[in-house]
Amino acid sequence: MKINMLLSGCLLGLLCFTACDSEGNEMNDYTHYVNSFIGTGGHGHTHPGAMVPHGMIQPGPDTRIDGWDSCSGYYYEDTTINGFSHTRLSGTGCADFGDFLLMPTVGEQRTEFLGTESQKRPFASAFSHEKEQAEPGYYSVFLDTYGVKAELTSTERAAMHRYTFPESREAGFILDMDYNIQQQINQVMEVEAVNDTVLRGYKRSAYWAYRQDLYFYAVFSKPFTYTLYTDTVQENDKQIPVCKMLLHFETAKDEQVLAKFSISSVDAEGAYKNLQAEMPGWNFDGVRADAKKKWNECLSKIAVKTNNEDQRAIFYTAMYHAFLSPNLFTDVDGRYLGMDLKVHTTDMKHPVYTIFSLWDTFRALHPLLTIVDPQLNTEFIRSLIKKHQEGGIFPKWDCVSNYTGTMVGLSLIHISEPTR
């Protein structure tokens, strides 16, 4: 009897959710209900980064390097921040990424090697949760060590940083090319200053994704001078390459310095095109507002009517996490890296996605999408079919066009059957 009553209540609630009127949704700010820090402690492996739904780029804070609870790069109990990288996973049991870490600095820029067991870079900053804020599409924290306020937001393929500096003749940034989440192997690292406001670079690393190729294009609002720091350090029987770009400039009190980063798995030209298409200007607040709008479009697909604010926060935070991945993997010109690790081109009406944790998501995420966004679910299935055509088999767990082989079964069957 109790079980039947509970099931009836759940079904009744579902009908209320799916029958909600769209006019009411547009008037409500559903991002207000999301707590981006839920899941960042314990073994949740989530992060408070500034993403848009299914974004290719995931800018956010990085607080730890190694161990199982470093999977997203951020752990709530940590008290220092290494910087802000542009790629990360959410809610997974495996780790990767943490690419192109940017850290604002004031004073000496330390680069010494602290060993692979250290969770901190020498330039890490202390921070407190009292001076930290996160909401869908936006992240902010005050870096106590440097007296700098950091803010992040993003579009699908590009991130914008805004840093408020104190007065200093020794302000700058460290772009840490060799930074990774967990102990990856950096096979190639290249970075160059195109001029005194533009950097571009490339990195190939091997870890869970056995070959990850990633390019970036970055533009800064303030001219800089730079020092390229490279080295090879010995630890036990390992030779570990080091590559960092140190940027230098002067700042006035409360001067804001902005940076725009875009990425591509195809080439630097792809990263450049992504930035030009999605972030041609410097309107940080406008980009943030657009990100909020995109999140409200997702979250408003289900309207929960309850006076219990805790239940509302739990629900919309879970829904927020559901729309973080799979991730867009197609540049604005339609090019992407296929499962054969060759460059392909697709019709932009049908972009290709990656990060398919199918063993996890076939149970609940994809059934949810058949209700709230069946067209997007169809696009995911279309991507998986292309991956079969390119690589010869369907992936179990596709990670940036790498067959990781993680987990068991062929879960694509379960998610494609309802669309037939």
What are these model-predicted stretches?
Residues I3, P418-T419:
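Twin-arginine (Tat) signal peptide motif
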Residues F17-A19:
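C-terminal motif of bacterial Sec signal peptides marking the signal peptidase cleavage site
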Residues M1-L7:
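Bacterial N-terminal signal peptides that target proteins for export
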